[in-house]
Amino acid sequence: MAKREMMLLFGSFNPVHRGHTALAEYAIERGLCDEVAMIVSPQNPFKQNMALASEMDRYSMVELACKATRYPERIHASVVEFLLEKPSYTINTLRYLEENNGHQMRFSILMGSDLINTLPEWREAEAIIAGYDIYVYPRPDEELRYSTQRTTFLADAPQCDFSSTEVRHRLESGDDVSRMLDGEVIKYIRERGLWSIEGKIERLTALIEQGATAEHHIERGKCYYRLNEWGRAINDFRRAEALDAECVEAVQWRKMSEEILEYRYKDIYNP
């Protein structure tokens, strides 16, 4: 009996967006595999300081996104890396999958041109290179600088003009993300309060308590500004100025906040 072809798409999916699922659909439609497993990584060894949503939140969002694809029965979310030792390394995941499912599945890997360029730095890269077909999709402004005999470059793969980082920033700013995220994923994010402006303030406050920089105070001040908390915003901009006397951005934001605050409390009928 022939083995089923399973393509693995690894990612933090913080959060999962339409670009991710478009790649999975493309792989199915091109006949590159029978199924796609979107493997949610608990920790990327190259991004250990990256602030991640919880494992289960990210898995739940991927599960919702997979159900919204054109092939929900063939595109799945996977928690396999949650079961393994952290930080997660691709070679460990591949060996686990081979031991448990290798008798019925043949695995391949889907990754961006930015990732394959770092492949020689991965743990036991030689074993990955020798043992698996690797399909590479183009990433903006990232040339393919490394390939193997088992590498296939997918020049016609769908390209995405935004990243999860941009999605998070837009969510924290209250901007529209409907072009970027599936509706059910957006609903989940809102219900769970993920990447809200209040959450950003909490994270910035924690960073400031560990050792403040002018940039941290400016970013938190901008959050307070968007919440119309002018006094707190001004305090943060002043602290940024104290930390960096040449910080033009802090001065500009402080003056703008002070002008708004002065106008709000000015008696326009008795100037």
Task: Go through each PLM region and give its residues.
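Nucleotidyltransferase catalytic core that binds NTPs
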Residues: 1-200
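Alpha-helical linker/edge segments of TPR/alpha-solenoid repeat scaffolds
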Residues: 197, 256-271
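Conserved structural position within tetratricopeptide repeats
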Residues: 206-209, 241-242
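Short coil turns that delineate tetratricopeptide repeat
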Residues: 211-212, 245
